Amino acid sequence: MTELFIDGAWVDGAGPVFASRNPGTNERVWEGASASADDVERAVASARRAFAAWSALDLDARCTIVKRFAALLVERKEALATMIGRETGKPLWEARTEVASMAAKVDISITAYHERTGEKRAPMADGVAVLRHRPHGVVAVFGPYNFPGHLPNGHIVPALIAGNTVVFKPSELAPGVARATVEIWRDAGLPAGVLNLVQGEKDTGVALANHRQIDGLFFTGSSDTGTLLHKQFGGRPEIVLALEMGGNNPLVVAEVEDIDAAVHHAIQSAFLSAGQRCTCARRILVPRGAFGDRFVARLADVASKITASVFDADPQPFMGAVISARAASRLVAAQARLVGLGASPIIEMKQRDPALGFVNAAILDVTNVRELPDEEHFGPLAQIVRYTDLDDAIARANDTAFGLSAGLLADDEQAWHTFRRAIRAGIVNWNRPTNGASSAAPFGGAGRSGNHRPSAYYAADYCAYPMASVESAQLQMPASLSPGLHF
């Protein structure tokens, strides 16, 4: 039950016991006691004590530890990928990709620190202007369940490089992945107190977010939770709040020559990771007319052949289970609400077993729904919207408070230029899936999708603050005095 990591040691939690389960088998994967408010207090105090020495450590020394962490990720790739698969249900092929991305993020983050922050000098009269960057102090990192290794890593790695200390609160649905990741950090030689792990559910998260001794909070998760955090920190400008949230993402399909290529990219956009990527396409906009009819028919044909299976099945499936049986039942309920509003099922979603997270890829035509809810349904539930022309498609695509990702599948380059100029989103792709993002590019969106860009270069920006100095090695009188001064 020693599942918390505080001040360099594994310790027991004093809060309620909870467990995680494999959503594809209902097998118990992890069990432990959650962190109480007192446990959170000890974790924050530990991080505060460790901050002075860690931030004073030479940057190269900090980077050496972070690089060792990356090397250990490569060595333990299979073990960590297996834990990710067991706890989240995602297929092993995808879990392995997640671990590889975690390791690759280290070099990207080190480069980002030097290029976007770091130290810069410029000569000036009687001295030099110096721009340095300083860490904030103790930061809380809240991680999601869909990428329980990679996404928290996108906050933790740049935070540590910059000299911050961290209290990490993972999703209660993926505590085993968090423990395995923190063990790798420990074995990489991270000093005691620099990274602390507090496991738990809502009460643990509230205790950490409310703690008056944190200097920043970095969050990846749902827009509803992120919005609550934003309200909570209203009137506290001293807190650095970085939010990366979800989206109601549109994929616009134009009339193209290669219809199977378009269907493939639509399948990837909507159903990769069982639809549990924040960049997945929730709305697929298809032209009215014969081409659109053929596209929808082909999309339904291919999607109907996708069979979800357990994470370690051989051969590997395209889709695993969604994160829990509860999440699966919520998706089926969301489908029922949309049908009640006038949506027409093309492929109806069904939950295979009420105790498991298996659902099939589903497609609804929502064109005739007059007041379509602006919601993110986090799973393989795609909505078809028919449009008349590109202007109509762009207007419908932008009809959302979110703005994370968007995509256009089109042979016409001019259509792409029109689309990219008019669309409102942080990730905008042409002839690529909406969930295709470069690890070396900013990741995030506009509107209710967030306020910062984690996981790549821009993460360095919110992990440190700029300190501007004008400096002269010699104290001396200026060559000329200001008017009215007499010496």
From Swiss-Prot:
Pathway: Amino-acid degradation; L-arginine degradation via AST pathway; L-glutamate and succinate from L-arginine: step 4/5. The keyword Manganese does not apply. NAD(+) binds at residues 221-226. Pfam families: Aldedh. It catalyses: N-succinyl-L-glutamate 5-semialdehyde + NAD(+) + H2O = N-succinyl-L-glutamate + NADH + 2 H(+). InterPro entries: Ald_DH/histidinol_DH, Ald_DH_C, Ald_DH_CS_CYS, Ald_DH_CS_GLU, Ald_DH_N, Aldehyde_DH_dom, SuccinylGlu_semiald_DH_AstD. GO terms for biological process: arginine catabolic process to glutamate; arginine catabolic process to succinate. PROSITE patterns: ALDEHYDE_DEHYDR_CYS, ALDEHYDE_DEHYDR_GLU. The keyword NAD applies. One of its GO terms (molecular function) is succinylglutamate-semialdehyde dehydrogenase activity. CDD domains: ALDH_SGSD_AstD (cd07095). Keywords: Arginine metabolism, NAD, Oxidoreductase. The active site is at 244, 278. Its EC number is 1.2.1.71. Belongs to the aldehyde dehydrogenase family. AstD subfamily. NCBIfam families: arg_catab_astD (TIGR03240), PRK09457.1 (NF006992). Catalyzes the NAD-dependent reduction of succinylglutamate semialdehyde into succinylglutamate. HAMAP family: Aldedh_AstD. PANTHER family: ALDEHYDE DEHYDROGENASE-RELATED (PTHR11699). This is N-succinylglutamate 5-semialdehyde dehydrogenase. It comes from Burkholderia thailandensis (strain ATCC 700388 / DSM 13276 / CCUG 48851 / CIP 106301 / E264).
